[in-house]
């Protein structure tokens, strides 16, 4: 029967190398060393050796997983992926995860709720983007939908406002219509559906101010007028008209600019 012929300490605190029949066999923790009463001269069957190795592998997997969880909450899938990257066997990984689930350190239902609540508090994602991100973290569709179902529409407003807040400062630079369109586009890109996007825009402090609208028309119109300065007059005005229309200005506002009522067009040409 195999016999322990030597036990030496590792550089890592609390770890020991076990030599059997004068050859290195495996390493164990101080806890395993004490619990198994592993001493020089101890006889071990092959079954004993395999049992010790398995216990060490399971213990190492749990320690790695606990360390990973100490930084922030994780999904079951994330923990399994992390252990896999650290070359932990599938059996040890599954055992560790099951242990952590039983201890309630891992719970995908709680993880989904916490992820959503954190997004509502400081994030900028709408339901569709949250759904996609949680699926990337390996959560089942029914778990995600159950967590999303618990959230009222009004609770998404703050996240939506964080998406579009910077556009408020574009007043006087862009037309009211263009600002609203940009806000709509950003909200949809961040996963807000039509109904939620409309709700956010209702809450957005964005009112059509005539002075700011005229200032935006002056800036955008002057920019376009200079851009097409090489074109003959009729073609130039047509291009400017198209440019301003695409940027959200009404026909009346565009005509006012082209008639020189907003700014003297000849003065623009001098710059």
UniProtKB/Swiss-Prot annotation:
GO terms for biological process: regulation of DNA repair. It is found in: Cytoplasm. Keywords: Cytoplasm. One of its GO terms (cellular component) is cytoplasm. The keyword Nucleotide-binding does not apply. Its main location: cytoplasm. The keyword Heme does not apply. InterPro entries: RecX_HTH_1st, RecX_HTH_2nd, RecX_HTH_3rd, Regulatory_RecX, WH-like_DNA-bd_sf. Modulates RecA activity. HAMAP family: RecX. Belongs to the RecX family. This is Regulatory protein RecX.
